């Protein structure tokens, strides 16, 4: 069973609108400069029991909450994919969007999805994927919704439909 390193009930930095952010414990990447290195340990935090997932669902069940963001640690580590699927499914049941921050690349995940039902499921449930390891030398506090310039903000439904990577564009951005 996966562990939860923490929950932010009304996050505003982890995607658009007001969101519920869930940090899953355990990370194989262990990026230097990570802002959440205590969550690298898979045993950190509290177990993500069915009751804990119900609690997250109740936090999501408010009209002012736009969506769920899954972070870590690494929410898409093999040990965490099942919990991420359960959390994302709870969000979708309430018609909330799902953002996932991962150190894996979109290309890595598409390759995994080719052979893994779990990775196919989580990609189908995901609206936006912020991919790539945090790279300290490319860190920039001015970046919106990502920590380092190498990371990409990907529109997953459009990418799956068009069979190519499609970057997410903020609906209200002025170009």
Task: Set out the residue ranges of the language-model regions.
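Short, conserved loop/helix-junction motifs that constitute active-site signature segments
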Residues: 120-124, 147
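Well-ordered beta-strand positions
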Residues: 127-128
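Structured loop/turn residues at beta-strand edges in well-structured enzyme cores
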Residues: 29, 63, 124
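Glycine-rich nucleotide phosphate-binding loop and flanking beta-alpha elements
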Residues: 76, 136-137
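Conserved Radical SAM active-site core
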Residues: 2-5, 18, 36-121
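Flexible glycine/acidic-rich beta-alpha junction loops that bind and position SAM and/or redox cofactors
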Residues: 13, 109-110, 137-146
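N-terminal [4Fe-4S]-dependent radical SAM core
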Residues: 1-23, 32, 36-42, 165-175
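P-loop/Walker A phosphate-binding loop and immediately adjacent motor/lid segment at beta-alpha junctions
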Residues: 79-84, 88-95, 99, 139-175
């Amino acid at each position: 069973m996966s562990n939860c390193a923490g929950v932010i009930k009304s996050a505003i930095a982890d995607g658009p609108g007001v969101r519920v952010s869930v940090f899953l414990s355990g990370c194989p990447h262990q990026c230097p400069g990570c802002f959440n290195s205590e969550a690298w340990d898979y045993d950190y935090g509290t177990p993500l029991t069915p009751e804990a997932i119900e609690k997250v669902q109740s936090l999501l069940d408010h009209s002012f909450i736009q969506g769920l963001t899954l972070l870590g640690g690494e929410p898409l580590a093999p040990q965490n994919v099942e919990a991420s699927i359960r959390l994302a499914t709870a969000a979708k049941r309430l018609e909330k969007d799902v953002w996932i921050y991962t150190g894996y690349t979109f290309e890595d995940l598409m390759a995994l999805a080719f052979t893994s039902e779990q990775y196919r499921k989580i990609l189908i449930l995901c609206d936006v994927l912020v991919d790539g390891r945090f790279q300290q030398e490319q860190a920039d506090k001015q970046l919106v919704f990502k920590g380092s310039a190498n990371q990409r903000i990907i529109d997953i439904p459009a990418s799956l439909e068009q069979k190519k990577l499609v970057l997410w564009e903020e609906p209200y951005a002025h170009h």
